[in-house]
Regions:
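Membrane-interface loop-to-helix entry segments
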Residues: 46-48, 77-89, 123-137
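Residue-level signature of transmembrane alpha-helical entry/exit and packing/kink sites
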Residues: 3-7, 43, 47, 77-84, ...
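Juxtamembrane helix-capping/reentrant segments at transmembrane boundaries
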Residues: 30-49, 72-76, 110-123
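Membrane-helix interface linkers and caps
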Residues: 20-37, 62-72, 172
Length: 198
């Protein structure tokens, strides 16, 4: 149980740190300290820090004492692997729809930020759920065919982080897009595609 608690705490501290970096307050502080050029490099730096700081969290399940919970036997494990493959594909498609290079911060770094208003994406995967990247991420981790106590702790922590993150993102999108996003919420599920899109 000690390993379980350590991993959950590690995910919690990572989530707080990651959310703090993404907050408008920290972005405003960075802009005040470094000037308008911050807009060009902040997203790229944010992603780099997020990836580097996630590495030790992901390493903990392999480094700490662990216990197997279950392993789905062949050929049934192939079903899980197919679902994971589809989830991985959905991640790529979803990122491409919303602007992969912008998401990574590369576009902002190479060219000055555009003054045009951001566009609300409601087509493609976003016709089925409002947060397809989170849906795909959850499917990717929970359909792993082998489960251990350490992986369970990691996946629980990451799932809570994704769900809380989705709620905060909903608030931000409502502020950013107003009535257009409120209307989108009425007709599109948040994470689970429970209806056929119109």
């Amino acid at each position: 149980m000690r390993s379980f608690a350590i991993i959950l705490l590690a995910v919690f501290f990572y989530s707080v740190f990651h959310s703090l970096l993404a907050s408008l307050w920290v972005k405003a502080r960075a802009r005040a300290w470094f000037g308008p050029e911050t807009e060009r490099w902040y997203r790229l730096a944010y992603n780099a820090i997020a990836v580097v700081s996630l590495v030790p969290v992901l390493a903990l399940p392999a480094l700490l004492p662990d216990r197997n919970l279950y392993a789905i036997p062949f050929p049934w494990a192939l079903i899980n692997l197919v679902i994971q493959g589809l989830a991985g594909l959905a991640l790529v498609v979803g990122l491409w729809q919303t602007g992969l290079w912008t998401f990574l911060g590369i576009r902002q770094f190479l060219a000055p930020p555009q003054s045009a208003s951001p566009k609300l994406v409601v087509s493609g995967l976003y016709r089925w759920v409002r947060h397809p990247l989170y849906t795909a991420g959850l499917a990717l981790i929970w359909f792993v065919p082998v489960m251990t106590t350490n992986l369970l702790a990691l996946f629980l922590g990451l799932s809570i982080y994704l769900l809380v993150g989705a709620l905060f993102e909903e608030r931000r999108l409502l502020i950013e897009f107003g009535e257009a996003y409120a209307e989108y919420q009425k007709h599109t599920p948040m994470l689970i595609p429970t209806r056929i899109p119109r």
